[in-house]
Design a protein with these regions (language model features):
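Active-site glycine-rich loop that binds ribose-phosphate moieties when present
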Residues: 423
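Protease-associated
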Residues: 297-383, 445-446, 450-451, 462, ...
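Solvent-exposed beta-strand/loop surfaces of large extracellular or lumenal domains
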Residues: 409-420
Length: 580
C-alpha cells in the first residue's frame, strides 16, 4: 500500500500533472514485469486515472472529446475484466448492440455521444456485477486495485499453463510497472506498433513488424485489427521511421540479441514502451545465433547457450511432400505467422482441440478461430496448426505459435466463419468440423484436403550449431532406435550409439504382428517352435542391418519387455479376425 502511494506521488512529481485533474489529468498504465517474458499471459490496464470529472478535462486538453470518452470506455472495460473479473463478453455485447442501433459497422464510427452512452451502460454492468458498488472514481483506489490485480494475474490459469510449458518457476513472482500513458489514438500522426529487429520466423536480419495508425497498443497485440507492415511507416511518418530504425539497432547492440519492441507515436513523437529478447522459432534461433557470431556480437559458446535444446525438435518437424503440394488446391492465402507444415481436421474451439489433438485422442487437428486469446493456449498446444481470421504477424496467435513451434497462418480476412454452426467458407468451399485442410506456415498458403508430409532435413546453420555444441559438451549422446531406418537416421543426426533398442517394437509391423500372435496362440511346444522360426529370421535381418548402420558404435538391446496380452488386439472386430 505504501509502495503504491509512493508511485502515485512520484508519477505526479515527475510528470508535473495531477491524477484526476479537471484541466490535464495524469493517466498511467499498469503492466507486469516478470523475470521471464510471458507474452499475453499476464494482465495490463491502460488509461488508469480517468473518472467522470477527469474525462472532461482530458477532452478539453486533447481537443478531441471522442478520443477522451473512448479512452474512458476502454479503461472501464479493462478494469472490470482484469480487476473485478467481470467477463469481457458483457461489454462486447453492449458495443455490438450500440453499433447496431446506430447503424455502424466499426467501433471507430461511434461518436462522442455514442461513447458517453456506452460509458453509462458499462458502469451499470459494473454496478450490477459488483452487487451495487459504483465504479471507483478515486484514482488512488483505482491504482491500488490495479496493482493488486496484476500481481494476482501471475496465478491465472493461462499463466500457470504457460509457465509449466516453458519451465518457468512459479515462485519467481512478478513485478508491476506503472508507466505514464502515451496515446497512439490521437489522430493521423499517432499510432502504435510492435517490431522485431530480425524476423522471428526465419531469423533474417532487418526490421520486421507492424503498426496501426490512430490506435492503442492493445489493438495490435489482440489481433482485432490487421495492421500495416512497418516499412509503410517510412511513407506515413518519415522522421519517426528514421529515429525508430536508429533506436532499434541501438537496443539490439546493447542487449546483443534480437529485440521485440512495443512503441507508440503520439502526435509525431516516438516513445518506446518496452523491449525484451524476442520469442522466435528454432529455425530463427539458429540463424540469429550464427549471424550474431559472424557479426562479432557473441562467441560460439554463447551461441550454443542461447538455443533452447528442446526447441531444436521443431527443425526435425515434417514438411509438405513437393509432389503432393503441387497437386494440392490452394483455397486461400494469409500471413505466414509461424513456419511448418500442418494438415488435419478442422476444429473451432480450444476445448475440442484439446480433446481430439495431441495429448487427447491423438488425432491431427487444425484450430480455426476468429482470433485466439491467451485462454486458448492448451488447445493451440494440442493442434498441428492454427488458422485465424484476424490479427497480424505480431498478434497473440502468431507469437505463441512461434514459441511452441506450431504452424500458424493468421489474418485470413477472406474466411467467413460461423463459430456457432461450426463451419467456415473460403475459396468457394464450405468446411465443417472434421473436414481436412492443410496449412503452410512458411508461405501462408491454405490448401483443401489432407496433404502428405515428409521428414525434414538438417540444414547448414543447424550443422554449425551442432558442431559448436560437440566442441563444448561433456556428455555423450545415444538414442532410442528399434528399426534399421531409425538407426540410419540416428547416425545421420550424430548419435554415438543406441542407448536402448526395444525388441518388441520389431514385431508391430503389419506383416509381422500376425506371425507373433500365431506364436502366442500356439497350443503345443512344437507349434510354438515352428512359429518362432519366421520371427527369428526377421529379427536377425533387422539386427544385421542395424549393426551395419552403426559402423562399430555400441547398442544396448532389451529383450521382450511387455506382457504378451499387449500384442493381441483390443477391438472387437480384430479379436474376431484373430479367433478365426
Amino acid at each position: 500500500s505504501s509502495a503504491a502511494s509512493d508511485v502515485y506521488k512520484r508519477q505526479e512529481e515527475y510528470n508535473g500533472k495531477k491524477f484526476g485533474d479537471t484541466q490535464d489529468p495524469l493517466l498511467v498504465s499498469v503492466r507486469s514485469g516478470a523475470r521471464a517474458s510471458m507474452p499475453g499471459m499476464m494482465d495490463t490496464i491502460l488509461n488508469l486515472g480517468l473518472n467522470d470529472v477527469a474525462v472532461e478535462g482530458f477532452a478539453v486538453k486533447t481537443g478531441n472529446p471522442r478520443f477522451a470518452y473512448d479512452s474512458y470506455r476502454r479503461f472501464i472495460q479493462m478494469f472490470s475484466d482484469v480487476v473485478m473479473e467481470v467477463p469481457k463478453s458483457y461489454f462486447e455485447k453492449i458495443i455490438d448492440e450500440v453499433k447496431a442501433d446506430k447503424g455502424v459497422v466499426y467501433d471507430t464510427e461511434l461518436t462522442a455521444d455514442d461513447l458517453k452512452e456506452l460509458i453509462v451502460r458499462f458502469k451499470a454492468v459494473y454496478k450490477e456485477a459488483m452487487k451495487g458498488e459504483e465504479f471507483p472514481q478515486d484514482p488512488k483506489v483505482q491504482l491500488m486495485e490495479a496493482v493488486k490485480a496484476v500481481f494476482r494475474s501471475w496465478d491465472n490459469p493461462r499463466a500457470i499453463v504457460y509457465r509449466r510449458m516453458n519451465d518457468i518457476p512459479g515462485d519467481w513472482g512478478t513485478a508491476v510497472n506503472v508507466q505514464t500513458m502515451v496515446f497512439g489514438n490521437k489522430g493521423d500522426t499517432s499510432g502504435t506498433g510492435v517490431a522485431f529487429t530480425r524476423n522471428p520466423s526465419t531469423g533474417a536480419k532487418g526490421i520486421y513488424g507492424e503498426y496501426l495508425i490512430n490506435a492503442q497498443g492493445e489493438d495490435v497485440v489482440a489481433g482485432v485489427r490487421t495492421p500495416q507492415p512497418i516499412t509503410q511507416l517510412e511513407k506515413d511518418l518519415p522522421e519517426c521511421y528514421s529515429q525508430f530504425m536508429e533506436l532499434a539497432m541501438k537496443l539490439e547492440n546493447h542487449y546483443k540479441d534480437m529485440q521485440d519492441m512495443e512503441f507508440t507515436i503520439e502526435e509525431g513523437k516516438l516513445y518506446f514502451l518496452q523491449t525484451r529478447n524476442g520469442k522466435r522459432t528454432a529455425q530463427a534461433a539458429i540463424q540469429i545465433a550464427c549471424d550474431l557470431v559472424d557479426e562479432g556480437m557473441i562467441t560460439p559458446r554463447e551461441a550454443v547457450m542461447r538455443i533452447e535444446a528442446k526447441s531444436l525438435d521443431q527443425l526435425l518437424h515434417p514438411m509438405f511432400d513437393t509432389d503432393a503440394l503441387k497437386a494440392g488446391e490452394v483455397i486461400g492465402e494469409a500471413l505466414p505467422a509461424s513456419p511448418g507444415a500442418a494438415a488435419g481436421k478442422v476444429v473451432f474451439t480450444a476445448e475440442e482441440a484439446k480433446e481430439l489433438g495431441k495429448g487427447g485422442k491423438g488425432e491431427r487437428v487444425i484450430l480455426v478461430r476468429l482470433e485466439t486469446s491467451p485462454e486458448d493456449i492448451e488447445g493451440m498446444h494440442a493442434s498441428q496448426g492454427i488458422l485465424t481470421v484476424r490479427g497480424g504477424m505480431t498478434s497473440h496467435a502468431a507469437v505463441v505459435a512461434r514459441g511452441m513451434g506450431t504452424c500458424c497462418v493468421s489474418g485470413c480476412g477472406a474466411i467467413s466463419i460461423d463459430e456457432e454452426a461450426k463451419q467456415f467458407t473460403l475459396g468457394g468451399y464450405t468446411f465443417t468440423e472434421g473436414d481436412y485442410i492443410s496449412l503452410d506456415g512458411s508461405t501462408g498458403k491454405i490448401y483443401k484436403g489432407d496433404i502428405k508430409t515428409v521428414e525434414a532435413t538438417v540444414s547448414g546453420n543447424f550443422g554449425r550449431i551442432m558442431a559448436w555444441a560437440d566442441e563444448y559438451r561433456k556428455l555423450g549422446v545415444r538414442t532410442n532406435a528399434d528399426t534399421p531406418a531409425d538407426t540410419k537416421n540416428a547416425v545421420r543426426l550424430g548419435a554415438e550409439g543406441i542407448g536402448l533398442c526395444r525388441t518388441e517394437h520389431m514385431f508391430f509391423g503389419e506383416d509381422r504382428i500376425p506371425k507373433f500372435r500365431r506364436m502366442i496362440l500356439s497350443d503345443t511346444v512344437e507349434k510354438r517352435v515352428e512359429a518362432l522360426k519366421p520371427i527369428g529370421e526377421f529379427q536377425k535381418a533387422d539386427f544385421k542391418a542395424m549393426y551395419e548402420a552403426l559402423e562399430g558404435r555400441p547398442m544396448t538391446v532389451r529383450y521382450l519387455d511387455p506382457p504378451l496380452h499387449e500384442f493381441v488386439p483390443t477391438e472387437e472386430e480384430d479379436i474376431k479376425k484373430l479367433a478365426e
